[in-house]
């Protein structure tokens, strides 16, 4: 086979496998906040399995732990900073009457 008809061969690069984000000693539990917080986005959403690089079983356990932590109020449902920037008293006038929004 002459050189012009030979298929292009890529050089083999060394492939380093990434370490799993959850070690064998880590317990997936709703009380382990340092572990759970790694799998939540800035807005408080649960990250997908592809982003987390978890197995199906690990992702299911993480999802259950996050939901338990949210229900027990150790983790917020939403992580929205705009919610806390609101002023203490907001008055809105509509015609002749004033409506107090913070009741």
From Swiss-Prot:
HAMAP family registered for this protein in UniProt: Ribosomal_bS18
Cell compartment(s), UniProt: Plastid, Chloroplast
Classification of source organism: Eukaryota, Viridiplantae, Streptophyta, Embryophyta, Tracheophyta
Alphabetical list of SUPFAM superfamilies matching this protein: Ribosomal protein S18
PROSITE patterns the record matches: RIBOSOMAL_S18
GO biological process entries: translation
Annotated NCBIfam families: S18
Quaternary data: Part of the 30S ribosomal subunit.
The family this protein is said to belong to: Belongs to the bacterial ribosomal protein bS18 family.
A Pfam family reported for this protein in Swiss-Prot or TrEMBL: Ribosomal_S18
Record bears the keyword Ribonucleoprotein: yes
Gene Ontology molecular function terms on file: small ribosomal subunit rRNA binding; structural constituent of ribosome
GO cellular component: chloroplast; mitochondrial small ribosomal subunit
Protein's name in the database: Small ribosomal subunit protein bS18c
PANTHER family, per the entry: 30S RIBOSOMAL PROTEIN S18, SMALL RIBOSOMAL SUBUNIT PROTEIN BS18M
Gene: rps18
